[in-house]
Amino acid sequence: MAQYSTNEFKGGLKIMLDGDPYTIVENEFVKPGKGQAFNRVKVRNLKTGKVIDRTFKSGESVEAADVLETEMQFLYSDGEFFHMMDPETFEQKAAPASAVGDAAKWLKEQAMCTVILWNDEPLTVEPPNFVELRVVETDPGVRGDTSGGGGKPATLETGAVVRVPLFIEEGELLKVDTRSGEYVGRVKG
């Protein structure tokens, strides 16, 4: 199995700790005036999502996590599982709702997602950075009602609620940033 030395640590690196796959969130190299240098690392458990702090001596080696990051197409959700398909092999996988988490509000059928697989099971599902979704419900914007920056909530076809400018109407197609949940612009269609 591949090993990573502490001097190879960087954000996003996948490692094994205590038999579980983790991803490095933050890495800080510390060289005290006295004593051995070390790495203070924040890691997220890919199975549970829990973030913990760990300290590694400088030069220590850690096993690489045998995880596969792949693009898959979201097919449908049956409430308990989100069904994904590999577009090349047409092989289907069922990701539990816990693996999808908050990404569920951005997933539309046929959308391509990044799926992290461990032991051939989906651990996490990340939506694309930008999605195009239709507005299904929003208050009508009243002309001249712009004091205070002007914005209103809009419910999208997946159930997500985003803040949009007053001129947005029901039925419009919007581009939304899934990382921040912010309105980016209209999609000309």
Curated annotation (Swiss-Prot):
The protein's job, in short, is: Involved in peptide bond synthesis. Alleviates ribosome stalling that occurs when 3 or more consecutive Pro residues or the sequence PPG is present in a protein, possibly by augmenting the peptidyl transferase activity of the ribosome. Modification of Lys-34 is required for alleviation.
What is the name of the gene encoding this protein? efp
Q: In which pathway does it act?
A: Protein biosynthesis; polypeptide chain elongation
**One Pfam family from the record:** EFP
**The protein's name in its UniProt record:** Elongation factor P
Record GO biological process: peptide biosynthetic process
Under the heading HAMAP family, the entry gives: EF_P
One GO cellular component term: cytoplasm
List the lineage, top down: Bacteria, Pseudomonadati, Pseudomonadota, Gammaproteobacteria, Chromatiales
Task: Identify its protein family.
Answer: Belongs to the elongation factor P family.
Cite the PROSITE patterns for this sequence: EFP (PS01275)
State one molecular function term (GO): translation elongation factor activity
Q: Which UniProt keywords apply?
A: Cytoplasm, Elongation factor, Hydroxylation, Protein biosynthesis
Q: Which residues carry this modification: N6-(3,6-diaminohexanoyl)-5-hydroxylysine?
A: 34
Organism of origin is: Alkalilimnicola ehrlichii (strain ATCC BAA-1101 / DSM 17681 / MLHE-1)
Q: Which PANTHER family match?
A: ELONGATION FACTOR P, ELONGATION FACTOR P (EF-P) FAMILY PROTEIN
Post-translational modification as stated in the protein's UniProt record: May be beta-lysylated on the epsilon-amino group of Lys-34 by the combined action of EpmA and EpmB, and then hydroxylated on the C5 position of the same residue by EpmC (if this protein is present). Lysylation is critical for the stimulatory effect of EF-P on peptide-bond formation. The lysylation moiety may extend toward the peptidyltransferase center and stabilize the terminal 3-CCA end of the tRNA. Hydroxylation of the C5 position on Lys-34 may allow additional potential stabilizing hydrogen-bond interactions with the P-tRNA.
The listed locations are: Cytoplasm
